[in-house]
Amino acid sequence: MKVSYHGHSVVKIEANGKVILIDPFLTGNPKTDLKTEDVKVDAILLSHGHGDHVGDTVELAKKNNAVVVAPFELATFLSWQGVNTHPMHIGGSHEFDFGKVKFTQAFHGSSYIDEENKTITYTGMPAGILFTAEEKTVYHAGDTALFSDMKLIGELNKVDLAFLPIGDNFTMGPEDAVLAAKWINAKTVVPMHYNTFPVIEQDPYQFVEKLQNCTGKVLEAGESITL
């Protein structure tokens, strides 16, 4: 399994001959190296409905005939836009031809914000994502605060690689993320959701230096880890 980071919370996984994208915020993302027109994808996994995570999902899904796996309300909302979706909910898992997906808790919001019409559409509960393929498990925490049930994620799963938000303000900051890493007990931890905007500026190298009992790795956009 090859896992690459593409800025903000964008993660690409190549496994079982398939390409999976998590939270494909490409257009308007100053930290990504990916261009929508160049992306080939078989499946898109979404943690929640905010624009900096749904991003280019509709365009990518339609262009590639990709399935979008998302929390139920968000999946329904996207299906109304002509997207092929597979709805799930927190605690549920499903075996796809590209791998197994399980949604975990995340403490955050989830909505579609229409700035022009000044409306906010509820898109269900936010989620974290456990993805398992080729006997390896990746945990993408989505946007979340620290919460004690992260201990359960670590107890019930053998996490090989975890992506944790460290930006603070909208998610947990570096100090809380250090504790999250301890509870999740992943072999390797990569920081995400930082330095995209001024309000979430952080030093990822200081974060990884504080990690205990795991390997911390800062990935620049386009860099990858092979599991």
UniProtKB/Swiss-Prot annotation:
Signal peptide coordinates: none
Gene3D superfamilies reported for this sequence: Ribonuclease Z/Hydroxyacylglutathione hydrolase-like
InterPro entries associated with the record: Metallo-B-lactamas, RibonucZ/Hydroxyglut_hydro, UPF0173, UPF0173_UPF0282_UlaG_hydrolase
Alphabetical UniProt keywords: Hydrolase
UniProt superkingdom: Bacteria
SMART domains membership: Lactamase_B
GO function term, MF aspect, one: hydrolase activity
UniProt keyword Thylakoid present: no
Family: Belongs to the UPF0173 family.
Protein name: UPF0173 metal-dependent hydrolase BC_4613
